Regions:
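Extended catalytic cores of very large enzyme megasubunits
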Residues: 1-143
């Protein structure tokens, strides 16, 4: 992940260097809490569920520019998503607070964003839409 935060591309101009810096800082904060066991992390979130593991590998774990997976468990995804979302808060204390809350909610299954958010939030290598569905107004229905 360190290489991803150093990567310079479209994300710099769209997300903004300050937001990326905030994101990296919060990501490292959540990592330290995982390491201290202050936040839940055991690396076995999926147990031995092969189907769930394959889904995470194919859809949700982000890949580097060489197409190599750089996340290894759902807790990595929770860390990335919670850090990226919380980085938009207005102060460092709020960013940390909300990243921790988002992480716990994701881990406990209280909050589950759509697949596009899981796949794209915080991926600095590739810009992806975070919108899961689009709604179009139907002017006239004759059914």
């Amino acid at each position: 992940m360190e290489a991803m935060f150093k990567h310079r591309g479209k994300a710099d101009s769209i997300i903004g260097k300050k937001n990326i810096s905030n994101y990296e800082s919060i990501y490292n904060h959540i990592s330290s809490l995982q390491n201290k066991k202050t936040l839940p992390f055991d690396g076995k979130y999926l147990s031995d569920n092969e189907l769930a593991s394959n889904i995470y590998k194919k859809k949700y774990y982000i890949k580097d520019l060489n197409n190599q997976i750089i996340e290894s468990c759902p807790e990595d995804v929770f860390k990335r998503v919670s850090s990226f979302i919380a980085a938009s808060e207005t102060s460092t204390s709020k960013q940390k607070k909300w990243a921790e809350i988002f992480y716990k909610d994701l881990y406990n299954g209280y909050f589950l964003p759509g697949g596009r958010v899981f796949a794209g939030a915080g991926d600095i290598y590739r810009l992806k839409t975070l919108a899961n569905c689009f709604v179009s107004k139907i002017e006239k229905d004759e059914i």
